[in-house]
């Protein structure tokens, strides 16, 4: 078996690293999207409550009373932050996918060179 050239090995290493980064980004994005759905559901439920409804916020091991308006504002702020995180991670995902496509092309070119060189060596050596 022929040894893999350092240039090809470097491309494969970079590809694997980008793939791992993409998996990490996708996992984080999925977590933020799940939390975003929960926040949106909470906002929807609280908006249906009367203005004087008793609302409690979970703080550690305690439930602390909170006004409806304050609870809604905190949830809306959290929603805005989560949407920003999702948007940022979506951009990172897109960039990583482009990077992976380019690396895949480069790897295929290197493999084609190796295959072509091996074919030439076999023809010349026969």
Swiss-Prot record:
One of its GO terms (molecular function) is unfolded protein binding. CDD domains: Prefoldin_beta_GimC (cd23162). Pfam families: Prefoldin_2 (PF01920). It is found in: Cytoplasm. Its main location: cytoplasm. The keyword Cytoplasm applies. One of its GO terms (cellular component) is prefoldin complex. InterPro entries: PFD_beta-like, PfdB, Prefoldin. One of its GO terms (biological process) is chaperone-mediated protein complex assembly. Keywords: Chaperone, Cytoplasm. It comes from the Archaea. Signal peptide: none annotated. Transmembrane segments: none annotated. The keyword Transport does not apply. Heterohexamer of two alpha and four beta subunits. Belongs to the prefoldin subunit beta family. This is Prefoldin subunit beta. It comes from Pyrobaculum aerophilum (strain ATCC 51768 / DSM 7523 / JCM 9630 / CIP 104966 / NBRC 100827 / IM2).
